[in-house]
Design a protein with these regions (language model features):
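Metal-dependent nuclease catalytic cores that hydrolyze phosphodiester bonds in DNA/RNA
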Residues: 1-109
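Nucleic-acid nuclease catalytic cores
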Residues: 91-179
Length: 180
C-alpha cells in the first residue's frame, strides 16, 4: 500500500500549504505540540468516546501496535462479520487513507459520523467529511449520510450527563466536491 495522502494531511494542506509541505519534507522544523495542544487532543478523545455511546455495541479498530494495513483488514473483517457500528473504521482508496470516527452500517448502506469537540461546524470539518465520502464512494460503498457530530453549547448539565443533549449532529446528504 503506497499512501500519498491521509485525511489529516489533506485538511492540513487546506488550512496551510506550507505546513503540509513541511510535514511531508522537513518534519524536524515543525514545533511539537505544547501542553495546550495536547489538552485539546485529549478533549477530542473524550468527546469521541462519549459519541461512541450514541452508537452502542460497536467494535473499535485499535490504534496502537497495528499498521494501517492491519486496520484496513480488521475493518473489512468487522464489516463482513456484520457489525453495525465500527469506531475508527479505516479505509484506503486512490492513495488516500481515512479513519472514520464512527461508521454505522444499516441495510447495506453506510453513515459516516465525524466527531468534533467544537461547538460549531467549521468548513475544514466539511472538507474532512468530503474526503471520507470520496474514499468510501470510490470503494463502492452506498453512502446514505454524513454527519458531523459536535458539542451543543446550549446544553446545561443536570445531575446526570445526557449525551443525546450534549452532542448535536449536523447532517449532510447532498454531495458535491464539498458537502453542502
Amino acid at each position: 500500500m503506497k499512501l500519498k495522502l491521509s485525511k489529516s494531511l489533506y485538511t492540513r494542506g487546506l488550512q496551510c500549504q506550507k505546513s503540509l509541505w513541511l510535514k511531508k519534507h522537513k518534519k524536524e522544523v515543525l514545533t511539537p505540540p505544547n501542553s495546550s495542544a495536547q489538552a485539546i487532543f485529549e478533549n477530542g478523545n473524550i468527546v469521541g468516546d462519549l459519541a461512541c455511546k450514541l452508537f452502542p455495541n460497536g467494535v473499535e479498530i485499535p490504534f496502537e501496535n497495528t499498521t494501517f494495513q492491519d486496520k484496513i483488514t480488521l475493518t473489512q473483517d468487522y464489516i463482513n462479520q456484520g457489525y453495525e457500528n465500527i469506531y475508527e473504521a479505516t479505509f484506503e482508496f486512490d492513495g488516500i487513507l481515512i479513519m472514520i470516527d464512527i461508521l454505522n452500517i444499516k441495510d447495506n448502506r453506510v453513515i459516516l459520523n465525524e466527531v468534533k469537540s467544537s461547538t460549531d461546524v467549521k468548513d475544514v470539518y466539511l472538507h474532512d467529511a468530503s474526503i471520507q465520502y470520496y474514499v468510501l464512494n470510490g470503494l463502492g460503498y452506498d453512502v446514505k449520510q454524513v454527519n458531523v457530530i459536535h458539542i451543543n453549547n446550549n446544553y446545561v448539565r443536570g445531575e446526570e450527563l445526557d449525551i443525546n443533549q450534549l452532542l448535536l449532529g449536523s447532517f449532510y446528504t447532498t454531495f458535491g466536491f464539498l458537502l453542502v
